[in-house]
Amino acid sequence: MKRHIRASGLTALTLSALTTMNCTTEKVDAAYIGPSQIEIQDGKMTPEVLLSLGRLSDPQLSPDGKTILYGVSYTSIEENRSCRNLFIVNADGTSPRQLTKDGKSISCARWIDGGKAIAYIQGGQIWKATTRGLSGDNPKLVKRTKLSDVPNGVGEFKISPDETKIMYVSYIHSDVKTPKDTDPKLDKARAYVAEDLMYRHWDHWVTELPHTFVADFKEGIRPENSTDILAAEKELYELPIEPHGGMSELDWSPDGKFIAYSCKKKTGKQYAFSTNTEIYIYNVADGSCTVIPMGGGYDTAPLWSPDGTKIAWLSMARDGYEADKNRLMTADFADGKISNIRDLTADFKYNAAGPVWTADSKSIYFNALAEGLQGIFRVNADGSITRITKENAWYDYDSPFAIVQNGEETQLLASWCSMDFPTELVKVAVADGKSEQITHENEHILSQLAEHKTEARMVKTVDGKDMLTWVLYPPQFDSTKTYPGIVICLGGPQGTLSQSWSYRWNYRLMSAQGYVVALPNRRGTTAFGQEWCEQISGDYSGLNLQDYLSAANELRSETYIGKLAACGASYGGYSVYMLAGMHGNTFDCFIAHAGIFDEKYMYYETEEMWFANWDNGGLEEYSYTPGQTGPAGDGETFGGIRQGGSPWSTNPRAVRHYANSPANNVTKWHTPILCIHGCMDFRIPYDQGMAAFNTAQMMGVPSKLVIFPDECHWVLQPQNALFWHREYFDWLDKWCK
């Protein structure tokens, strides 16, 4: 067994000198929420401490390259809300200053007019404000002007390079109807009427669809003087892609004449079963559209080269498989036509994400999860790839948001995080990967916390493979004492336990409560190549669960481990329900958040059918066959869609999958279990959690149910989040301490 160890705290970071935040002195909005001044007792991290941390996001480098604009959200547990305001910092990390102290959140802030002004969204509309005193200690936004009047609100926007045009996201009615659609007098009636899939998605009923509109960038932006990019389409598509797509799915060409965008031009059942999303080139002048002919699965994140001669994007080859390898593609563009499509990462083992062109249009920086760490890479036109960040750097880096020249040295401006701290800005030297943090938003809080230790272990699986497992130890860990342990079961199922930071599944917080926390990167994780990732599809009840038991047995072998829990969300919740019926006496308690309990009924009630169809055993040969209508007589093809992962399929993989559902093994349940679910969870509906709890009660198993009526697959409201943490740790402490 191989081990590598890192300690938390200031010594684990490459920090520049800490500086004092300068703030404006003008009158503050009464609804403003500012940085927390929480005082921590005995260095112990608590849920209250976690929720007090500022959340930094969306950095933007000024046109002159001297100043970084970014936002920070602060949370008030008492008011049960967060508020996001704007900050600036010099590009070298000196002199951080607060730019706004508003009571309403500000988002999507962008430099305009050569840095003399900023455009942003507040209250669902686009605003413009002049910057004043940016180089001093008291910067301000003045002369605030509302530019838009869009009744359905604006979600995001992107301004053309010459700042004469703007594209923005708003909403149109969908095919899902409500009572007032047929009778305006029924404005107090609540119902949804659907005649096809998908009528709900993630956390909302699909009564509206996002569309992207183009308008002149000036005061008076309204629907009547805007052009819908999808206006020529006969069907109701979405742009950007729901539920988590944004402006990263659209990009202006450097000359402002074209917009590249990603869109799944399918509706109903075809939409629900397919991931076939294409890249389209929209001509702003005449509204014509050209598709990049890829077929297959997701094609996303289009990005023009600075010289306008090429387009880069991310592409998955197989329709219906959302965890396919994400390839970095490029194509030439001239005279409105696409040519020379090529895969720059054909020989790269990992998934590409977040492409960023170099200024000379010859190379692309991107990030990728590789062996449990998210790093930054560069690929040249010939497909040669160089890792920029250091291979042994225990951080997760986002893609660079800017490339700067500091004398002879090229630097990347990006953000990073780890299990020790949330997102901060960082500069990375391209030559050697040396990283220097340039913001310290939460240092006044983190510096009060007791240090802990993180370890990387390679655990042997039942078939002799090495599995990366992160292990976090409590502060003041003493191997001669006894500690309870937690095995974290990953969601997804395709994902990775890396150095990411979470405000719910926070492993530093768990270790601070006195637990040894193990994070196994079992079969199905995405940072170890496609073979390791793809093994899990059609084998939910197989090797990946044995991987958890291997990690648990590894932990159990340590003399300092006492009782042991298994906890997880989503697929991790499914894993917990499965382990409850097969673990013997390995675990002393379980926690399942938003887990799948009954695979058969999960297929009937979930929304993204492509995922269930593929992973439940359908795979490629049973996934999606366009062009047919009605039952084909083979027991699998209905409505033109092969449903080989369905409960009625005779496909051997699917038959095995449903036979091994957690609900079929409940007579072996005997270990205390906490079931948590949100009623607005449409990915894994909440009756799955209730069914698991009801069953545990009927089996005589000590159990508890926590239901959040107004939360989805995640827990987002501050007071609900705090309550979630309290229930989580109360249950662990009751059965493991």
Label every PLM stretch briefly:
Residues 125-211:
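Asp-box/WD-like beta-propeller blade repeats and closely related beta-sheet repeat scaffolds
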Residues 28-33, 83-84, 171-235, 262-265, ...:
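Predominantly five- to eight-bladed beta-propeller fold
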Residues 441-563, 569-570, 604:
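Cap/lid segment of the alpha/beta-hydrolase catalytic domain
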Residues 519-737:
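Active-site-proximal cap/loop segments of hydrolase catalytic domains
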Residues 78-84, 121, 204-208, 270-277, ...:
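Short, solvent-exposed loop/turn segments at conserved positions within beta-propeller repeat blades
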Residues 58-60, 167-169, 192-193, 198-211, ...:
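Non-catalytic accessory segments flanking enzyme active sites
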Residues 53-68, 103-119, 149-166, 199-212, ...:
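Conserved beta-propeller blade repeats
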Residues 90-94, 130-135, 217-221, 283-287, ...:
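Short loop/turn segments that connect beta-strands within beta-propeller blades
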